[in-house]
Amino acid sequence: MKINHLGIATKKIEDVISFWTDSLGLETMHTEIVEDQKVRVAMLPIGESRIELLEPTSEDSPISKFLEKRGGGIHHIAIEVEDIAAALQKARDNGATLIDQEPRIGAEGCLVAFIHPRSTGGVLLELVQTTDVGGAS
């Protein structure tokens, strides 16, 4: 297991990306739209992890709702796991409140699932499986 990325919510990626690229020297790995989450994503590698900038593409997206309640900032921490189904089952068996009962396709074609902050001490946790999923690794 390792930290795959930190998700940061922002109203517009263009308004903040220059800080990460110009001020810190990070490079944008890629951007994409994740249709089912109604979000635009920009990934910026940093060491063995990444910063994931999240911009809502719709007023009813989860990121838009987050921004309305809390403003921009850290939205979630993503932990990379080898077997997401097993990790979800273990969390379920230990009483965690799962947002996603089953993994789904997320950014970069990875399998993802979220665990509710009430089970993690207040942090939205994303589980990510990158291997053998849509060519991602």
PLM feature spans:
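Vicinal oxygen chelate
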Residues: 42-43, 79, 88-137
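Core segments of cupin and vicinal oxygen chelate
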Residues: 8-50, 93-96, 101, 105-109, ...
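Short, conserved charged micro-motifs
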Residues: 15, 84-89
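Short loop/beta submotifs within extracellular cysteine-rich repeat domains
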Residues: 16, 24-27, 50-51, 59-62, ...
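Amphipathic alpha-helical interface surfaces
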Residues: 62-63, 87
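Regulatory and interaction patches adjacent to catalytic/ligand-binding sites
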Residues: 66-67
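N-terminal beta-strand motif that seeds the catalytic metal site of vicinal oxygen chelate
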Residues: 1-17, 72-81, 131-137
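Short, structured motif recognition centered on aromatic/hydrophobic residues
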Residues: 3, 20, 44, 51-54, ...
